[in-house]
């Protein structure tokens, strides 16, 4: 994914984590974000609050975040 552009999200709450995705809560609402669309997904865990997360520009557009 080195060619991807990233969208930076602040104040992210990780509601749920699976092997494939994170359920996050941000100001715009709740969204399932695939782990492969998150920069450094191993840095996040279920229950994290106030996190800064970078997601691919593509998934942000797909989810209506960007």
Regions found by a protein language model. Give the residues of each.
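Catalytic phosphate/metal-binding cores of nucleic-acid and nucleotide-processing enzymes, i.e., regions
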Residues: 1-66
């Amino acid at each position: 994914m080195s060619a991807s552009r990233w969208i930076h999200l602040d104040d992210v709450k990780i509601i749920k984590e699976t092997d494939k995705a994170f359920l996050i809560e941000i100001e715009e609402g709740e969204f399932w974000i695939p782990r492969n669309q998150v920069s450094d997904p191993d840095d996040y865990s279920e229950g994290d609050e106030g996190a800064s997360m970078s997601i691919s520009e593509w998934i942000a557009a797909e989810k209506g975040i960007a």
